[in-house]
A protein has these predicted regions:
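Short capping motifs at secondary-structure boundaries
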Residues: 98, 113-122, 212
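Functional-site microenvironments in short loops/helix caps that host divalent-cation chemistry
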Residues: 23-37, 42-46, 68-69, 75, ...
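Positively charged n-region of N-terminal signal peptides that target proteins for export
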Residues: 1-4
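Sec-dependent N-terminal signal peptides
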Residues: 7-14
């Protein structure tokens, strides 16, 4: 199945960028960041933020379907040898108590938001060339109008791969893919009302939060909640390997991205609450879908902290050495595509990043609110 026209736009822009004088510096930065190889490396991007159109009023916060996470202090970040460079150093963090959704936002809940507001998600809109130009070298020519189509990224299992550091081998831009049509225009979410909503950009998640009177969790809040009251645990359930004992989360078993053995009972998304909750009563804090956090992404953020960080909200801006011009936010928790031999994003310390205007088949969110 051939790539959508928007993928051609991506390749077109990359070819232009490769002609710029700073290519050598960008390549050097890329080599320095090899240890950050992740589920998002070489991910096709829309290359343009979507303007906020959420001019609706916020609702009064309801704590139904939420659980109160107690205040506490914990060691944030990795302490073993499994983490990537951006998970170090481990550091002390204090968080105040907050409420958190016990599950990822579902299709049913997101539909209520859409019905109430008429909001159109990023994936349902055509890319904005005027916004796109802001992230490209001055003088970049405009591609043909035919490539500016509403689309989103859908997973396709390839027959073979050359490198697990090149996610473009299994992600394709699909015209008409969005939260209502997760695999494209011929798919739907009928009977999947209790599944996590996907193809959600950071902008979309923020719009939903505004409508519900809630917010996205900070990265520190997310990790504290994911640990479920445990200390120095690798996973939300403790330290037992994910493929030992009973299935604990919706992840990928087998050879990623070619063959999933479905040992956990699922080939792609699972309904929320399909697996046991962690110590705080939170479901799917590992696997199923990546979850947006409010923080900008910088690989060196932890290294710049000192002492005990009190309710940290992340860096003031974004910087990803692999894509310096693309603003990115943090995503946490891993997805149904995470595998022990690949990103292992279901570890509680694992950090990933995605451009704010990008929606994918494995990305959703959950909300938090203050007391």
């Amino acid at each position: 199945m051939r790539r959508s026209l928007l993928a051609l736009l991506y390749l077109f822009i990359l070819s232009l960028l490769s002609c710029q004088p700073n290519k050598a510096k960008e390549e050097e930065a890329r080599h320095r960041q090899d240890s950050l190889a992740s589920c998002e490396k070489n991910m096709p991007s829309r290359f343009g933020a979507v303007k906020d159109s959420s001019n609706f009023a916020s609702n009064k916060v309801s704590h139904e379907g939420m659980v109160l996470i107690p205040a506490g202090q914990f060691a944030m970040g990795a302490s073993d040898q499994e983490g990537r460079a951006d998970e170090y150093p481990q550091h002390q963090v204090k968080v105040s108590s907050f409420w958190m959704d016990v599950t990822e936002v579902t299709n049913a809940s997101f539909k209520k938001f859409i019905d109430a507001t008429g909001y159109q998600t990023t994936a349902e809109r055509k890319p904005d060339w005027e916004e796109m130009k802001k992230q490209l070298p001055v003088g970049t020519p405009k591609p043909p109008d035919s490539v500016f189509v509403a689309a989103s990224l859908v997973f396709y299992a390839p027959k073979r791969v050359t490198s697990l550091n090149d996610a473009s081998q299994w992600w394709r831009w699909v015209k008409g893919a969005d939260w209502k049509h997760p695999q494209g225009p011929n798919s739907n979410i009928k009977g999947k009302e209790n599944f996590p909503v996907v193809h959600i950009s950071w902008d979309d998640a923020m719009a939903y939060c505004k409508w519900s009177g809630k917010r996205l969790p900070t990265e520190a809040e997310w990790e504290f909640a994911a640990r479920g009251g445990l200390k120095n645990n690798k996973y939300p359930w403790g330290n037992e390997d994910i493929e030992k004992g009973k299935p604990k989360a919706n992840t990928w078993q087998g050879s990623f991205p070619i063959k999933n053995t479905d040992w956990d009972g699922y080939n792609s998304l699972a309904a929320v609450k399909s697996f046991k909750a962690n110590g705080y009563g939170l479901y799917d804090m590992a696997g199923n879908v990546w979850e947006w956090c409010s923080d900008w992404y910088r690989p060196d953020y932890y290294a710049k902290l000192s002492g005990v960080a009190n309710n940290p909200k992340g860096p003031a801006d974004s910087y990803d050495p692999m894509e310096p011009t693309v603003p990115k936010r943090v995503v946490r928790g891993g997805s149904f595509m995470c595998n022990a031999a690949y990103c292992k994003g279901y570890r509680v310390t694992s950090r990933m990043k995605t451009s704010v205007d990008t929606g994918l088949e494995h990305t959703g969110f959950r909300c938090v609110s203050d007391n």
